[in-house]
Structures are given as structure tokens and as C-alpha cells.
Amino acid sequence: MVPTLYGRIQTRIVLLAVVGGIWTLIITPFLPTGESLGRSYQTTFLVLLTVLVLGVLWEFLYHGLQQFRWEKDWPTFFGLLTMINEGLLVWLLIKAGAVPGVGDVPLSAFLIQFVTTWLVVWLVANGPVQIFFTRWRFRGGRFW
């Protein structure tokens, strides 16, 4: 079954909160932020929250674009490519000072966190979730 809009939103929220949260806990101490560990954790989790909130908004745009496709879904690889426009928007918002609580973030730290988190979440969504949560796929990507 093709994921529904609400299924995509639920999947994004669950995977970013759980998988992205765990990955952020692991990777933050190794990021070249130049800040204290507490400040680094605050920044990385605020960036993750920004990605989640903007990602939910992106889903509405993606849903509208998918209506022009016969199968009403992206090919799997397109889901990976959306990393580019979403990452660029988050980076521009951070640089513009539009993300509350996030100061100056080095580009290298942002790229390491964003790209690796995106890849981990994408791999989990296209691997273990589809294997271990078979009902998730039959329910249009919804968890509840």
C-alpha cells in the first residue's frame, strides 16, 4: 500500500524522534562544534527538532507534488534526495538566526549531524521498519 499523508507524517515523527534522537545522542560528543557538551547537545537537538517540524510541513508539499504521479509515491531514491532541499532550508534558517536557541553552528558540524542522521533514518525506514513492522506498510505508513 502507498503511504498516506498522515502515514508519512507519523513515520517522520516517530523515526526522527526515536532513531534520530538516539543517533543524535551518540554523535553529538564527536561533532566539531567548539562548544561545551551541554551546549552541543542543546544545539543538536534543536536542529533535530527544526528538521522534524519543517519536515512535517515539507510532507504537505511532497504530497501535493505526488498527486501528479500515477502511483502517488516517490521512488525510494527520491526520498534520499529530499535531504538536499530540506538540509539547505534548515541551514539557511540557522544562518539567518531564525531557529531559536541555536547560535553559530559550524558548517562541518551541521553537515555531519544532518547527513548522517538523514542516512540513518532513511536506512531504518527502508529496511528494518518494513521488515519488522509489516502492518505499518499495510496501514499506509501509519503507526497508530
Description of each model-found segment:
Residues 1-144:
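Aromatic-rich, lipid-facing transmembrane alpha helices and their immediate juxtamembrane interface loops
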